Amino acid sequence: MQICGIDDAGRGALLGPLVIAGVSLEKKNLRKLTSLGVKDSKKLSPKIRENLYKKIIQTVDNYYVAKIPPRSIDASVRKHLLNNLEAKYMAKVVSKLDADTSYVDSCDVKPLRFGKEISQLSNGHKIKSYHHADSRFVVVSA
């Protein structure tokens, strides 16, 4: 069974793009990520994150990175649609990776609503949406 983990980085347009990244692998291989030392990137130094990146890419079956330019972020903020923009790009990653189940880090105050939106935008893919998913699921941390 293929599972996918998706997280964002850089929600502030002032500092650059918003990046949505996902990885997919067989569920039985999750221990490989744990043994590499993969965990929430906020708990790792930049050097360790950089070293882990190469190892993660070699370990997972597939990955996809989407970058949202600052002007798109600014336009969404003005319309109060930043969460919607993020859901659209997460759905794009979900569709590209096409796993059986995708775990996402919810930016919405209502994770279930966020997961349903991503599922609808990705043609019914199974989504598990949680707050702090990057701390709870190693596949999201990757």
Language-model regions, residue ranges each:
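Acidic (Asp/Glu) carboxylate-rich active-site/surface patches
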Residues: 1-4, 8-17, 23-142
